[in-house]
From Swiss-Prot:
PROSITE patterns assigned: RIBOSOMAL_S4 (PS00632), S4 (PS50889)
Keyword annotations: Ribonucleoprotein, Ribosomal protein, RNA-binding, rRNA-binding
Assembly and binders: Part of the 30S ribosomal subunit. Contacts protein S5. The interaction surface between S4 and S5 is involved in control of translational fidelity.
Gene3D superfamilies: Ribosomal Protein S4 Delta 41, Chain A, domain 1, RNA-binding S4 domain
Record GO biological process: ribosomal small subunit biogenesis; translation
Physiological role: One of the primary rRNA binding proteins, it binds directly to 16S rRNA where it nucleates assembly of the body of the 30S subunit. With S5 and S12 plays an important role in translational accuracy.
Organism: Rhodococcus erythropolis (strain PR4 / NBRC 100887)
Similarity comment: Belongs to the universal ribosomal protein uS4 family.
Molecular functions per Gene Ontology: rRNA binding; structural constituent of ribosome
Gene: rpsD
ATP-binding keyword on record: no
Pfam families on file: Ribosomal_S4 (PF00163), S4 (PF01479)
Protein name: Small ribosomal subunit protein uS4
Length: 201
């Protein structure tokens, strides 16, 4: 299954959650798209679980196959499966770039990574799904600092709260990974237990 590259607002409306953050089109019409979008739908337990899984997938921009692999890994780790899953998703490099404020959306962050603008521990990494570890140092390549996205990032970094597990050195746009996040540090409206229930059937 190919990655969804269509209008994200349409997915936001279908799942009834702002997948982008600050999506004015969603705020104007926060109901499902289509002729019968405002009609009430009987929400079964399965539908709620499916919607929660889809919210997570589209929020982080992950395909179903990859998401299922993340779930299996989370399930095999000690601790709560749902929290493990969110920790895995949050530790993706594209998400870290977004969380640090170097990109306005996760889609833009993915693009910055794939275009080879970033170094992790002084090594070029252009894979959005690359997973950061505690004490990793993420830098913008020297020649990339003069490009428009990073000029904008320099001016706007700090406008959005940075989670406590990350630190951004504004002038250099350096990201320090102090730790991997705890559930309380993941500011996202997801009921991860519903995702666990979906895959447990």
């Amino acid at each position: 299954m190919a990655r969804y590259t269509g209008p994200i607002t349409r997915k936001s409306r279908r799942l009834r959650v702002d997948l982008v953050g600050g999506d004015q089109a969603f705020e104007r019409r926060p109901y499902p798209p289509g002729q019968h979008g405002r009609a009430r739908i009987k929400e079964s337990e399965y539908l709620l679980q499916l919607q929660e899984k889809q919210k997570a997938r589209f929020t982080y921009g992950v395909m179903e196959k990859q998401f299922r692999l993340y779930y299996k890994e989370a399930n095999n780790r000690p601790g709560k499966t749902g929290e493990n899953l969110l920790r895995i998703l949050e530790s993706r490099l594209d998400n870290v770039v977004y969380r640090a404020g170097l990109a306005r959306t996760r889609r833009q962050a993915r693009q910055l990574v794939t275009h080879g603008h970033l170094l992790v521990n002084n090594k070029k990494v252009d894979i959005p799904s690359y997973r950061v570890s505690q004490y990793d140092i993420i830098d913008v390549k020297e020649k990339s600092l003069s490009t428009l996205p990073f000029q904008v990032a320099r001016e706007t970094v700090g406008d959005r709260p940075v989670p406590g597990w990350l630190q951004v050195v504004g002038s250099r746009l350096r990201i320090l990974v102090h730790q991997l996040p705890e559930r309380a540090q993941i500011d996202i409206a997801l009921q991860e237990q519903l995702i666990v229930e979906y895959y447990s059937k």
